[in-house]
Regions:
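A structural signal for multi-pass alpha-helical bundles of membrane permease subunits
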Residues: 1-170
């Protein structure tokens, strides 16, 4: 084990990449799924159902590789290259999936896209299960804005769902 940990360059690179990925993707996915759920929860039920399906659908798609391969294709037909070329941001297509500098951000984006659905659903169900009576009582007790509602009512009432969401992002 000592030789593997101390001398093996592949091990140290893999460990570094794993730590970077875990430190960025986990908390970002947790935060993003909560913010999106909080935003979507404000819509009327029919719109909320459509938006919930849109955010959950990527979790159901098993062929994420093919979808993202088309998006990040290295020619001018890839969605990202096509958009950046048409906006004049780049002058020639970027080979996204073979350039080391872009690979980790792309992997993080794909991971967020695929894993956010379950956390999003748990957060939106938690938001919908917070009793309206608690908000009314909070207004009587002096809560005056949405941030205070979030801090003193919503987040404490959602602790089990937030814990589940955090565990699912690991």
């Amino acid at each position: 084990y000592r030789r593997m940990i101390v001398e093996d360059a592949t091990f140290s690179t893999t460990l570094k990449n794993t730590l970077v990925f875990a430190i960025i993707a986990g908390p970002l996915g947790f935060l993003l799924s909560f913010v999106l759920a909080w935003f979507v929860n404000e819509f009327e039920p029919k719109v909320r159902a459509v938006l919930s399906f849109m955010f959950y659908a990527p979790s159901l798609v098993g062929n994420a590789y093919f979808i993202w391969k088309v998006a990040f294709s290295g020619d001018s037909y890839g969605y990202v290259n096509s958009l950046l070329l048409s906006l004049g941001i780049i002058t020639e297509p970027v080979i996204w999936l073979k350039t080391e500098a872009y690979l980790m951000p792309i992997v993080i984006i794909v991971q967020l896209w695929q894993s956010m659905g379950v956390s999003f659903l748990s957060n939106i169900s938690g938001l919908q299960n917070v009793s309206r009576d608690m908000y009314e009582a909070g207004a009587i007790d002096g809560i005056r804005n949405r941030w205070q509602e979030l801090r003193y009512i919503t987040l404490p009432a959602m602790q089990p769902m937030l814990l589940f969401s955090a565990v699912m992002q690991i």
